[in-house]
């Protein structure tokens, strides 16, 4: 029996197989061979297509199973780590409505800083453990204010790892 680990990063998706009983690493691969592209339409913006993550996740899983000669039916659990604070918004069919605004995008920092001022330092530190300057919620509010036609169609919003799961 085996564990499958996935790491959905902004440069690649990694897949690793570990033997469940011994903890021995069997094989680790990453897709694509070169880095995934990041779209930057303006300064301080950074976006990626969630469907590209999905494509490379599927490719990496198939590769790690094939190259290790492990039957996928012997995988007993899957763990996912991923880039934080990325905003993925989908419609009722689970299709992304726009590219994901990822962790290194700074367009919504002022929105987060305004929230910090309104909420106050005590509340932010006790509930958020940080200033919400670049948090996903700030990015969601940016979409609401700047792309209302997209915001109206949102069925669910999530982080990159949730989209993959």
Features from the language model and the residues they span:
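Carbohydrate-associated surface elements
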Residues: 105
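Short, flexible helix/strand-to-coil boundary loops that buttress conserved ligand/catalytic motifs
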Residues: 91, 116, 147
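N-terminal glycine/serine-rich phosphate-binding loop of ATP-dependent small-molecule kinases
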Residues: 1-98, 110, 126, 153
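Gly/Ser/Thr-rich active-site cleft segment
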Residues: 2, 8-10, 123-165
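Residue-level signal for well-ordered alpha-helical scaffold segments within enzymatic catalytic domains
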Residues: 59, 63, 114, 142-145
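Hinge/lid segment of periplasmic solute-binding proteins
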Residues: 109-120
